[in-house]
Amino acid sequence: VHWTAEEKQIILAIWAKIDIEEAGAAALSRLLVVYPWTQRYFKNFGNLSSPTAI
């Protein structure tokens, strides 16, 4: 994909509004709850046995 300069600026402006820490944590939590088999890839994270623990 080849973005124009204007499209690149729009994309950067949208991503600048996102709280990466919060969105990343929420996305990872949903991943581990909705697809519990993915927990095996994150064994170093500790207790992932329930949504509350995650």
Curated annotation (Swiss-Prot):
Keyword Transport part of the UniProt annotation: yes
PROSITE patterns: GLOBIN
One of the GO biological process terms: hydrogen peroxide catabolic process
Domain of life, source organism: Eukaryota
Name of the protein in its database record: Hemoglobin subunit omega
Listed PANTHER family: GLOBIN FAMILY PROFILE DOMAIN-CONTAINING PROTEIN (PTHR11442:SF95), HEMOGLOBIN FAMILY MEMBER (PTHR11442)
Molecular function terms, GO-annotated: haptoglobin binding; heme binding; metal ion binding; organic acid binding; oxygen binding; oxygen carrier activity; peroxidase activity
Function: Hemoglobin omega chain is an embryonic-type beta-type chain found in prenatal and neonatal marsupials.
